[in-house]
């Protein structure tokens, strides 16, 4: 989502709170919990899942392996739920022509560097760059080239933009910032 006026461009960046992340975290949690439940029921010899008798799964080796996969899956699921609740990767890009300042803000993981805030002068922006890689893992990323700082990505690698969409966004941003556009 973006908001634009004559002198201000504000681009809101969606973080890890996407529908696909919610679905993967839920599926992983339910599957790993079921694995742990089957492994525990095979250890105790009780039938907690009515799909099959507990005597069919021996604790050693099947129950041990299923318990291990269940515990590992619960750890990965808890990691996904934490990134969703912290909304890692969300933030905004603010381009202010009136003040001549560009601000880039992102939320990170908890700790000393939870808030990632970058601030530049517009006169230090050399160009807007599109990096396109074709093939099996095709990706298109929009960068902002800063004098003395290198290239800063403005889009996520997970976003699959069509060539027309990324070119249009780059052209609009380059026109707004009054800098050239490069394609690699």
Curated annotation (Swiss-Prot):
Domain of life: Eukaryota
Membrane topology annotation: Multi-pass membrane protein
GO biological process, one term: photosynthesis
Main localization (coarse): plastid
Transmembrane annotation, as ranges: 22-42, 57-77
Pfam family, one: Ycf4
GO CC field: chloroplast thylakoid membrane; photosystem I
Keywords: Chloroplast, Membrane, Photosynthesis, Plastid, Thylakoid, Transmembrane, Transmembrane helix
Location of the protein in the cell: Plastid, Chloroplast thylakoid membrane
InterPro entries in UniProt: PSI_Ycf4_assembly
Known role: Seems to be required for the assembly of the photosystem I complex.
Family: Belongs to the Ycf4 family.
Name of the protein described by the UniProt record: Photosystem I assembly protein Ycf4
